């Protein structure tokens, strides 16, 4: 089963120079757990900030999220996988990198994101179709 059958194509992003507080607001407002972090200038790679990053790196340390820039806690570079790969390929990559989501790319451009929940949904569908391979 191909990744693009389960990936989310609406990717929410935020600038790296914004505050962690801004990320919290956006994530809570949109009911999402991660944001693609966009870096400007000479360092144009992407990063990711997750709810886990915010809780463990900022809130648990009683730091002020308004005074911390996203760039300082974002994970970088992102882990990505080609759109043509399978759900099993994505699951193996997530396990190897110990991450909960991978960004899906096509010809070097980010076209989606696939989460652990998406992988579990694919597993249920494969099992229901009788195509499940453990």
What is the role of each PLM region?
Residues 14-32, 38-39, 80-98, 104-105, ...:
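The conserved cystathionine-beta-synthase
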């Amino acid at each position: 089963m191909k990744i693009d059958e389960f990936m989310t194509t609406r990717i929410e992003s935020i600038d790296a120079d914004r505050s962690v507080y801004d990320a919290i607001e956006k994530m809570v407002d949109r009911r999402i757990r991660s944001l693609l972090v966009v870096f400007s200038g000479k360092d144009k790679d992407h990063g990711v900030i997750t709810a886990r990053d915010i809780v463990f790196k900022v809130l648990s340390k009683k730091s002020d999220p308004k005074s911390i820039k996203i760039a300082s806690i974002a994970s970088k570079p992102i882990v990505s996988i080609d759109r043509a790969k399978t759900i099993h390929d994505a699951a193996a990559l997530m396990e190897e990198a110990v991450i909960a989501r991978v960004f899906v790319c096509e010809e070097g451009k980010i076209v989606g994101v696939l989460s652990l929940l998406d992988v579990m949904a694919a597993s249920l569908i494969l099992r229901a179709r009788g195509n499940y391979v453990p």
